[in-house]
């Protein structure tokens, strides 16, 4: 079952991206390095509630 998750920047805490994940394959929280337009650089983004 795929669910929508929100990714937030770890530096400025802004919620920048929405993506989907398969809970069966990825039971843990997702971490991705993505571009944050407020920080102006690529930063680590983590899944939020």
Swiss-Prot record:
GO BP terms: translation
Membrane-crossing residue ranges in chain numbering: none
One Pfam family this sequence matches: Ribosomal_L33
Top-level lineage group: Bacteria
Keyword terms: Ribonucleoprotein, Ribosomal protein
Gene3D superfamilies (UniProt xref): Ribosomal protein L33
GO CC entries: cytoplasm; ribonucleoprotein complex; ribosome
Gene Ontology MF terms in the entry: structural constituent of ribosome
Family (UniProt): Belongs to the bacterial ribosomal protein bL33 family.
UniProt xrefs under NCBIfam families: PRK00504.1, PRK00595.1, rpmG_bact
Family annotation (PANTHER family): 50S RIBOSOMAL PROTEIN L33, CHLOROPLASTIC, LARGE RIBOSOMAL SUBUNIT PROTEIN BL33C
The protein's name: Large ribosomal subunit protein bL33
